[in-house]
Curated annotation (Swiss-Prot):
A GO CC annotation given for this chain: cytosol
Residues that, per the record, bind Mg(2+) 2: E22, H128
Entries under InterPro entries matching the protein: DHBP_synth_RibB-like_a/b_dom, DHBP_synthase_RibB, GTP_cyclohydro_II, RibA, RibA-like_sf, Riboflavin_synth_RibBA
Function statement: Catalyzes the conversion of D-ribulose 5-phosphate to formate and 3,4-dihydroxy-2-butanone 4-phosphate. Catalyzes the conversion of GTP to 2,5-diamino-6-ribosylamino-4(3H)-pyrimidinone 5'-phosphate (DARP), formate and pyrophosphate.
Binding residues annotated for Mg(2+) 1, in chain numbering: E22
Name listed for the protein in its UniProt record: Riboflavin biosynthesis protein RibBA
Keyword Protein biosynthesis in annotation: no
Gene3D superfamilies: DHBP synthase, GTP cyclohydrolase II
Keywords: GTP-binding, Hydrolase, Lyase, Magnesium, Manganese, Metal-binding, Multifunctional enzyme, Nucleotide-binding, Riboflavin biosynthesis, Zinc
Residue positions binding GTP: R235, I236, H237, S238, E239, Q256, E277, G278, R279, T299, T334, K339
EC nos: 4.1.99.12, 3.5.4.25
Gene: ribBA
Native organism: Thermotoga maritima (strain ATCC 43589 / DSM 3109 / JCM 10099 / NBRC 100826 / MSB8)
Length: 388
């Protein structure tokens, strides 16, 4: 973030690339620092719509008027500052700075030449508008930014080669949407403890903790058994109604859950229960995937046929729960290296990992083999035991 701030102070915008939107790229620059030269650069080399972004709530409090839309765009009435035409680079820069100062709508002339867009929160929408506000704030400036979509010589807005050459030519920093999301989750506390209660179970007496969730709105929860050592024994368990509740033999989820609860009862630890049914695709789609597996596809192939990636999960909620519980260092019980990476990228230190196996049955053997071969799950040991 210090490097980002230095670039902005030198008058260099950041290029923000969204690989989930066919590599669409925007210039991003803090509105409070914008100058005539930066505006001129944006217009010359960006060529897309020139916009200033701010939080929607902030704009509404200042009286800005939202335009009607039939496709979800969050545009407000465009404005100008001052008495000139408003179109020059000098005038547009001043308009952006006045917006960043917190000036009210009635102080501007409208309609003007600076398009205003309201952000609705990065956790709700991972778009350039919302990301630009986080970038500006992370670099130490107010939550107001100027963004311009980058078009190539033919007006194409999705030319990654052109964007990267532009970055190289002018020595501009490049960020991807995932980079911003990672810093956003690492630096902000978006979940906090809401309630906790005693939970007596067949495995022992635990605490169950719920959370106020401003990250994804889902009712994730944690099971805690004290005392907690450093590093804390942690298991991230993705919801599996069929395995956890109905004791399905198609997977090993229920038996893994039971095995960790037994461990917790004896040694202490935290079970994080994430509402990520079917590796993040939901129960209905999981059942559809089961149907495809009944026809001979494996679990990865079934996901892809349904239009999903092999694993749709993000472990940001798990990292946020640990932060809400005051945990920074963990002993992670997992066979899945993606969970280790998923915690570490959000600022949780995984000191060590330990394997946690479930039950192998004739019904889940092929499924487990697929997870090992195609998803990288470390299950070789359990297959050696079964085959011996």
């Amino acid at each position: 973030m210090e490097e980002l701030r230095e670039a902005f102070e030198e008058g260099k915008p950041v290029i923000l690339i969204d690989r989930n939107r066919e590599n669409e790229a925007d210039f991003v620059f803090p509105a409070q620092l914008i100058t005539e030269d930066v505006v001129s650069f944006f217009v010359t080399y960006g060529k897309g719509l020139f916009c200033v972004t701010a939080d929607e709530e902030d704009l509404l409090k200042r009286g800005f008027v939202k335009l009607s839309s039939n496709y979800g765009a969050n545009y407000f009435v465009p404005v100008d500052w001052g008495t000139g035409t408003g179109i020059s680079a000098l005038e547009r820069a001043e308009t952006c700075r006045k917006l960043a100062e917190g000036r009210y709508f009635h102080e501007f002339r409208y309609p003007g030449h600076v398009t205003v867009i309201g952000g609705i929160g990065f956790q709700r929408r991972k778009g350039h508008t919302e990301a630009s506000l986080e970038i500006s704030e992370l670099a130490g400036f107010s939550r107001h930014a100027v963004i311009v979509e980058i078009l190539d010589e033919k007006g194409n807005s999705h030319n990654l080669d052109y964007v990267l050459k532009l970055s190289e030519k002018f020595s501009l920093p490049v960020l991807e949407m995932d980079d911003v999301w990672r810093e956003f989750v690492k630096r902000k506390l978006l979940m906090k403890k809401k309630a906790e209660a005693t939970l007596p179970t067949d495995f022992g007496v635990f605490k169950v903790v719920s959370f106020e969730n401003h990250l994804d709105g889902k009712e994730h929860f944690a099971i805690v058994k004290e005392p907690l050592e450093d590093p804390v024994a942690v298991r991230i368990h993705s919801e599996c109604v069929t395995g956890d509740v109905l004791s399905s033999l198609r997977c090993d989820c229920g038996s893994q859950l039971a095995n960790f609860l037994r461990y917790m009862s004896a040694h202490g630890g935290i079970l994080i229960y994430l509402r990520q049914e079917g590796r993040g695709i939901g129960l209905s789609n999981k059942i559809a995937a089961y149907s495809l597996q009944d026809k001979g596809l494996d679990t990865v192939e079934a996901n892809r046929v349904l239009g999903f990636s092999e694993d749709e999960r993000d472990y940001a909620p798990a990292a946020q729960i640990l932060k809400a519980l005051g945990i920074e260092r963990v002993l992670l019980f997992t066979n899945n290296q993606r969970k280790t990476v998923g915690l570490e990228k959000y600022g949780i230190e995984v000191v060590e990992t330990k394997r946690l196996y479930g039950r192998v049955t004739p019904h889940n053997r092929f499924y487990l083999s697929t997870k090992m071969k195609k998803l990288g799950h470390e299950l070789e040991e359990i297959f050696r035991e079964v085959n011996s």
